[in-house]
């Protein structure tokens, strides 16, 4: 039988978002900013205690929400749990964005902002980070005069690693009195900065967080939206009653119950960022200051060939050549052994070429 489905034009106009390739588990995964050292052993112990009865019940949220609110330093009514960080972003479109209304992003950045915007039928305004990967603060402030519904800011930004300072952020919030400001803090733990203390001062501010990075729980899909209680009550209307599964709640509670594990991971990431940047600089590779668990590097025109060689040897990186220029790559800070293995192969396989972009050091 031949039928014609009444598909929305916004869906027809875009391609399917392709998830990472299968078969990554036995590779050196330096491509998606996962915690390759793994979650706390306490998480596995907690998950092992789940019973058939637990699995048969719909999840209950009061106690997990109270515990996670304490972790973030907010009240339970200021916290909304979501099915991963991606879902934390989607709910802003369901709440605030109508077809043909405008949102603003600064690129290169996390692609899901544009993804959800296009599905919602929104008009996407896109500014560019400067050549040195600095945030375009003047252009953002000017754009806020143009009837924007939502401004999305990744802080630190993915993939540049840029951290926007408190002064700049406050300037934005003081101007954005009729615009929702979403601060995506997926990598906040690696930056020593968060806007969470500001949520009661600025009702238009929402902070999105995830347990995929520092807690090492990417497969369980747990995110959070945090904002002042009155504003968050509106967002809550756009959420289903059971957005998060019990296993994710149990795992998150166990992870935050082992803060030493997360602190050690953050300290190791910070150490590796400095060391890897220094080693790459000595090879003539430009890197950019990063406040995330990754580095952005520029290998120039011979970079893509190197990345393919590394993939063939089981080391996965996130090639950003298509949207940033040939040779740009984002490198997750894995374990010390993984980073030594990466640098050893780069020294062996990379053949530098004449540079189109000038080399600068951090």
Give the location of each predicted region.
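N-terminal small-domain helix-loop-helix segment of the aminotransferase-like
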Residues: 2-84, 91
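Short acidic capping loops at alpha-helix termini that bridge into adjacent secondary structure
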Residues: 75-79, 99-102, 185, 203-204, ...
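PLP-dependent aminotransferase-like
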Residues: 95-153
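Conserved PLP-binding catalytic core of the aspartate aminotransferase-like
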Residues: 131, 270, 281-313
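Active-site phosphate-binding strand-loop segment of PLP-dependent enzymes
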Residues: 131-189
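PLP-dependent enzyme catalytic core of the Aspartate aminotransferase-like
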Residues: 167, 309-313, 318, 322-362
């Amino acid at each position: 039988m031949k039928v014609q489905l009444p598909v929305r034009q916004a869906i027809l106009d875009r391609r399917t978002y392709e998830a990472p390739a299968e078969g990554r588990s036995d590779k050196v995964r330096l491509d998606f900013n996962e915690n390759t050292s793994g979650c706390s052993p306490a998480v596995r112990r907690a998950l092992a205690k789940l019973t058939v009865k637990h699995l048969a019940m719909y999840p209950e949220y009061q106690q997990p929400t109270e515990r996670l609110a304490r972790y973030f330093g907010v009240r339970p009514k200021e916290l909304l749990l979501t099915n991963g960080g991606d879902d934390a972003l989607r709910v802003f479109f369901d709440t605030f964005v109508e077809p043909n209304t405008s949102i603003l992003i600064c690129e290169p950045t996390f692609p899901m902002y544009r993804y959800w915007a296009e599905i919602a039928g929104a008009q996407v305004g896109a500014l560019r980070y400067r050549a040195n990967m600095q945030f375009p603060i003047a252009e953002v402030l000017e754009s806020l005069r143009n009837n924007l519904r939502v401004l999305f800011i990744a802080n630190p930004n993915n993939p540049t690693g840029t951290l926007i300072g408190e002064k700049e952020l406050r300037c934005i919030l003081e101007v954005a009195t009729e615009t929702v400001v979403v601060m995506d803090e997926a990598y906040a733990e690696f930056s020593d900065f968060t806007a969470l203390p500001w949520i009661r001062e600025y009702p238009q501010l929402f902070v999105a967080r995830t347990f995929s990075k520092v807690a090492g729980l990417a497969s369980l899909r747990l995110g959070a939206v945090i904002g002042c209680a009155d504003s968050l009550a509106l967002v809550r209307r756009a959420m289903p009653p059971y957005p998060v599964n019990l296993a994710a709640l149990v795992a998150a509670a166990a992870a935050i119950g082992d803060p030493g594990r997360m602190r050690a991971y953050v300290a190791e990431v910070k150490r590796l960022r400095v060391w890897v940047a220094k080693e790459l600089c000595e090879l003539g590779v430009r890197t950019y200051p990063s406040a995330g668990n990754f580095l952005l590097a520029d290998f120039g025109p011979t970079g893509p060939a190197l990345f393919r060689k590394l993939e063939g040897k089981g080391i996965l990186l996130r090639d950003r050549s298509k949207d940033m220029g040939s040779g740009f790559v984002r490198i997750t800070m894995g374990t010390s052994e993984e980073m030594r293995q990466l640098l050893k192969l780069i020294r062996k396989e990379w053949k530098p070429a004449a540079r189109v972009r000038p080399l600068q050091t951090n």
